[in-house]
């Protein structure tokens, strides 16, 4: 959640402005990205006044303002309360972009990913259907992991 401008709007608008878009295009892309993550009401809020969940959503809006084909995320659900975690999952599931997510939050992975690549000691152990991999008790134990909660 790296934010460095003074307001949410300015942070989300940073990339479009640096891409040389007109101010009208910048405003359109920025507001569109804020709406996708449901934080348009925070556009004028100072970055330092945001909660952890709001910072995550602002960071995702910043990414979306660039209209990427692929989004890379490292532990996106860490330090989120249950409500913001569920909100993040719902947002990720609505995004059309390909998502590459590194996470130890196996329940979030179950809820958001069709395909999983399981790594251990920097090596690919298994690549395939998320549910098949994460519900394989023997594989998970061999990899030093536990089954997702509730399974």
Language-model segments: residues:
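Conserved ABC ATPase "signature" region
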Residues: 24-42
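Hydrophobic anchor residue at the start of the ABC signature
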Residues: 59-60, 88
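Conserved beta-strand-loop-alpha-helix hinge in the C-terminal portion
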Residues: 123-146
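Catalytic Walker B motif of ABC-type/P-loop ATPase nucleotide-binding domains
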Residues: 71-74
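Conserved ABC ATPase signature
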Residues: 46-50, 54
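H-loop/switch region of ABC-family ATPase nucleotide-binding domains
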Residues: 103-104
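A short, surface-exposed alpha-helical micro-motif characterized by mixed small hydrophobic
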Residues: 109-111
């Amino acid at each position: 959640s790296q934010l460095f401008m003074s307001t949410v709007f300015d942070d989300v608008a940073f990339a479009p402005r640096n891409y040389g878009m007109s101010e009208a295009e910048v405003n359109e892309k920025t507001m569109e990205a804020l709406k996708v993550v449901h934080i348009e009401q925070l556009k004028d809020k100072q970055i330092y006044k945001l909660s952890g969940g709001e910072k995550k959503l602002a960071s995702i809006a910043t990414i979306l303002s660039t209209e990427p084909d692929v989004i890379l995320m490292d532990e996106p659900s860490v330090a989120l309360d249950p409500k913001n975690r569920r909100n993040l999952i719902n947002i990720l599931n609505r995004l059309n972009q390909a998502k590459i997510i590194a996470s130890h939050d196996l329940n979030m992975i179950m809820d958001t990913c069709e395909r999983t690549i399981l790594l251990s000691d920097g090596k690919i152990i298994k690549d395939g259907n998320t549910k098949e991999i994460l519900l394989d008790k023997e594989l998970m134990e061999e990899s030093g992991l536990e089954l997702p909660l509730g399974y």
